[in-house]
Structure formats: C-alpha cells, structure tokens
C-alpha cells in the first residue's frame, strides 16, 4: 500500500506543479509589464521635459528678437522725431 501512496503523492505533485509554474509566470509577466510601464512613463516624462525646454528656449528667442526689433524701431522713430523737433524749435532768421 505504501507504493500506491507514494505514487499518488507523486501524481498529485505533478498536477500541482504546472499551476505553481503558471503562477510564477504570471507574477513574472506582471513584473515585466510593471517595469515596461514605468520605463515608458520615465521616457515620456523625459521627452516632455525636453520639449518644454525647447518651447521655453523658442519663447525666449522670440521675445529677444521682438524686443530687439522694438528697440530698433523705437531708435529709428526717436531719431526722426528728434530731427523734426529740432528743426521746428530752431530759431528762424527773420528777413531784413
């Protein structure tokens, strides 16, 4: 009777072993999916940070160009206005 009991125990162990392997595979699969999800999130965050940095740099460049253009325009306008003002306020000679 003992050999039958040993055979039955071995048979039950063989039945349980695939279930344990499936559980480990599922656990491994879950870990890999979690790792891939975290890696994807990290990559997206890094890309977003780079894009925000590029957008910020473009905005700074645009503002610098705009202020430079405005400064040039103001200098030109001021020069013309100053010339006009000086000619309008300069004393004119009256005819003799």
From Swiss-Prot:
Location of the protein in the cell: Secreted
InterPro entries, sorted = Apo-CIII (IPR008403), Apo_CIII_sf (IPR038195)
Recorded superkingdom: Eukaryota
Under the heading Pfam families, the entry gives: Apo-CIII
Instruction: Enumerate the Gene Ontology biological process terms.
Output: cholesterol homeostasis; lipid transport; lipoprotein metabolic process; negative regulation of high-density lipoprotein particle clearance; negative regulation of low-density lipoprotein particle clearance; negative regulation of triglyceride catabolic process; negative regulation of very-low-density lipoprotein particle clearance; triglyceride catabolic process
Write down which residues bear the modification named Methionine sulfoxide: 63
Renumbered to this chain, region (Lipid-binding) spans 68-96
First and last residue of the signal peptide: 1-23
**Keyword Secreted listed:** yes
- Keywords of the record: Chylomicron, Glycoprotein, Lipid degradation, Lipid metabolism, Lipid transport, Oxidation, Secreted, Sialic acid, Signal, Transport, VLDL
Main localization, broad class: secreted
GO MF, one term, reads: phospholipid binding
PTM section of the record: The most abundant glycoforms are characterized by an O-linked disaccharide galactose linked to N-acetylgalactosamine (Gal-GalNAc), further modified with up to 3 sialic acid residues. Less abundant glycoforms are characterized by more complex and fucosylated glycan moieties. O-glycosylated on Thr-92 with a core 1 or possibly core 8 glycan.
Which residues carry a glycan?
A: 92
- Any GO CC annotation of this UniProt entry: spherical high-density lipoprotein particle
Residues with site note (May interact with the LDL receptor): 41
Task performed by this protein: Component of triglyceride-rich very low density lipoproteins (VLDL) and high density lipoproteins (HDL) in plasma. Plays a multifaceted role in triglyceride homeostasis. Intracellularly, promotes hepatic very low density lipoprotein 1 (VLDL1) assembly and secretion; extracellularly, attenuates hydrolysis and clearance of triglyceride-rich lipoproteins (TRLs). Impairs the lipolysis of TRLs by inhibiting lipoprotein lipase and the hepatic uptake of TRLs by remnant receptors.
Q: Its family?
A: Belongs to the apolipoprotein C3 family.
Q: What is this protein called?
A: Apolipoprotein C-III
């Amino acid at each position: 009777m003992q050999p039958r009991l040993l055979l039955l125990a071995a048979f039950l162990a063989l039945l349980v072993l695939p279930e344990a392997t499936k559980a480990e595979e599922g656990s491994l699969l879950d870990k890999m999916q979690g790792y891939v999800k975290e890696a994807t999130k990290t990559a997206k965050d890094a890309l977003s940070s780079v894009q925000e940095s590029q957008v910020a740099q473009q905005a700074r460049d645009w503002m610098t160009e705009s202020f430079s253009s405005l400064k040039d325009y103001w200098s030109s306008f001021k020069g013309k206005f100053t010339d006009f003002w000086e000619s309008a306020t300069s004393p004119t000679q009256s005819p003799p």
